[in-house]
């Protein structure tokens, strides 16, 4: 069975995959797999930009999304979807007419002019023509997108956003907790301060020392409520709450005592 593996840590947001998909499918139909994709309003391959943290401790994470390749969509679509021998699926442009209900699935878009739902086909027409990978994968300069037989792909630690999907992800962003320890009296940052990230149950999740800029960052921690406990030699330990349940947390510049 064919599948995609997307390594979020490798994606730099160049949008090549998104542009290549539009280039391949806009202005051309590839029947029986797909009718022409509209110039606007549809992104069968779409790169989501996530701005995380707060100034000056911010990060931008890019997450490519590819639609249409899931068992859930197949179950809902019935005979309007076709599964190829290689496992790729596509919505039949003729049999799917009028099925606007299928647009509730991620990456499925409604074509008002043609009255059909449309989504990724895995560039089945190119695979039939001898290509080894779809356009989006071929255009990725960092190899963030990979495509092939499941048995040949490295799925160790990979996860699906949708159960039964042919799209697997590696290094999906979790949360980060960051800050800077400052000696305001001396007008200097605190280098080498001990910092711990402590869970609600009191367990130390991670620990590190502040760097040459007085900064610390606990990256890829699970979404949860934490406490940051830090101590500068010769000073009393201090504690700050850091609720990373919903968002990444920057506790800002904090005093040594």
Regions inferred by a protein language model and the residue ranges of each:
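Short, ordered, surface-exposed loop/turn motifs in non-cytosolic proteins
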Residues: 175-177, 184-201
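Hydrophobic loop/turn residues within beta-sheet-rich immunoglobulin-like superfamily modules
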Residues: 11, 70, 94, 221, ...
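Flanking helices and flexible, charged tails adjoining ferredoxin-like Fe-S electron-transfer domains
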Residues: 29-75, 79-80, 90-180
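Exposed aromatic-hydrophobic patches
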Residues: 91-93, 215-220
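Structured interaction patches on ligand/partner-binding surfaces of diverse proteins
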Residues: 233-257
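Short, acidic Ser/Thr/Gly-rich low-complexity loop/linker segments typical of extracellular
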Residues: 200-215
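A short, solvent-exposed beta-strand micro-motif common in secreted/extracellular proteins
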Residues: 222-234
